């Protein structure tokens, strides 16, 4: 239809991330108004103009969890069978053909039942050890995709469109579920000052730009301070970022 942008999604599961700029507490009514105009509906209802009533959700304690913690707490049988189930609903890409042929040897693939005979010894302890080791390996593997922007570091291509870079994909999924491609957004990070000392809230810093970072028309850049846990830092002036619109 006119005025509608078509986006093809190759899987049955998808998600949408939307950012709305908030310029302070007095700006909340504007944000609420924008949120009130957001709707998710079948295309047929949009075209017909009929009023669409979305199905009401329900709370389930079973689904009340932090996704990454849930995955990391799974035993190997649960993990691989859940992957097999999800691959039925979300078909692997054509580029995954070679990998699928390899892992099919232990019954990992769409609709399969994981071959538990490959699990030997102390399964729980071996799985726990492997998870620890593989996370360290993923971090190491991810470094080859790290790029420099002055003193800042960011993860570069093929982030957001990983193709067969499975380790890179897993690292991003572990740390943040998903990521934009570099054409859409960059997330440079810095942890040391100009002298190589670790940044700390006990000191004051000056961030100097020769010129503002270039962005496309309508874009923006911001500077945000995060703690060691990668969450925002509570502070007495209630300041969480500096935002510049272009």
Regions found by a protein language model. Give the residues of each.
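A compositional/structural signature for long, glycine/proline-rich flexible linkers
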Residues: 1-244
């Amino acid at each position: 239809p006119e005025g509608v942008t078509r986006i093809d999604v190759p899987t049955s599961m998808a998600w949408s991330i939307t950012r709305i700029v908030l310029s302070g507490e007095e700006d909340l009514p504007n944000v609420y108004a924008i949120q009130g105009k957001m709707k998710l509906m079948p295309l047929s209802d949009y075209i017909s103009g009929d009023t669409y009533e979305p199905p009401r959700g329900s709370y389930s304690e079973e689904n009340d969890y932090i996704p990454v913690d849930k995955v990391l707490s799974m035993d190997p049988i649960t993990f691989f069978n859940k992957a097999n189930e999800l691959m039925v609903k979300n078909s692997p890409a054509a580029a995954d053909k070679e990998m699928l042929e390899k892992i099919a040897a232990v019954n990992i693939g769409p609709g399969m039942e994981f071959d538990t005979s490959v699990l030997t010894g102390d399964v729980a302890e071996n799985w726990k050890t492997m998870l620890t080791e593989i996370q360290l390996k993923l971090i190491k593997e991810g470094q080859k995709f790290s790029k420099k922007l002055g003193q800042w570091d960011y993860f570069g291509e093929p982030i957001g469109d990983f193709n067969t870079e499975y380790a890179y994909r897993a690292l991003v999924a572990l740390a943040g579920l998903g990521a934009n491609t570099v054409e859409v957004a960059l997330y440079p990070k810095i942890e040391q000052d100009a002298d190589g000392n670790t940044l700390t809230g006990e000191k004051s810093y000056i961030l100097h730009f020769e010129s503002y970072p270039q962005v496309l028309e309508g874009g923006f850049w911001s500077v945000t301070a995060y703690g060691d846990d990668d969450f925002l830092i509570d502070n007495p002036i209630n300041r969480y970022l500096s935002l510049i619109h272009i």
